[in-house]
């Protein structure tokens, strides 16, 4: 896998493990302003690119977010890297938490796909300006409370989504 890393700038290495604790890959996150913020290095080619599988309890609702760093701020959370968000099938009580990017068509499409399938989703309120959970934490927002009050499903999710999206 070393030959796949074509960068020399310092990066944060975020390990991905299987449910059994086996290392399956790494995400290398840029510290600066590189146009390539993330580099995914798969060690096990057919393993899902889901961060936190080794740390969750399936007995409780799982919160499914986009970024590994975001998942560290939430109890019982995993992060889907790359195209894994399109492949994940949440359980009945799991919650999809997409970044707060109502102008991003790809984000809107992923969120709407999950709403259409009846999954529980977070629709960020209009007063939240931050893009992701990490930014919300840095702004001293109570992310747990925001998630609890803004998790929707079915018709209510569709209605909230229609007013949230700008794409």
Model-derived regions, located:
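Phosphate-handling DNA/RNA-contact segment within nucleic-acid enzymes
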Residues: 1-93, 107
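TOPRIM fold recognition
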Residues: 36, 59-62, 67-167
């Amino acid at each position: 896998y070393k030959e796949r890393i074509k960068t020399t700038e310092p990066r944060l290495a975020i390990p991905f493990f299987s449910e059994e604790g086996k290392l399956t890959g790494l995400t290398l996150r840029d510290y600066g302003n590189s146009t390539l913020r993330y580099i995914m290095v798969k060690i096990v080619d057919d393993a899902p690119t889901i961060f936190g599988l080794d740390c969750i309890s399936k007995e409780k609702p799982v919160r499914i977010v986009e970024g590994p760093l975001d998942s560290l701020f939430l109890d019982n959370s995993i992060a889907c890297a790359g195209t894994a968000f399109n492949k994940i099938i949440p359980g009945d009580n799991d919650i999809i938490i997409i970044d707060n990017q109502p102008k991003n068509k790809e984000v809107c499409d992923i969120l709407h796909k999950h709403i259409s399938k009846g999954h529980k989703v977070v629709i960020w309120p209009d007063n939240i300006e931050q893009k992701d959970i990490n930014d919300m934490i840095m702004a001293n927002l109570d992310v747990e409370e925001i998630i609890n009050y803004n998790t929707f499903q079915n018709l209510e999710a569709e209605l909230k989504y229609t007013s949230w999206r700008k794409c």
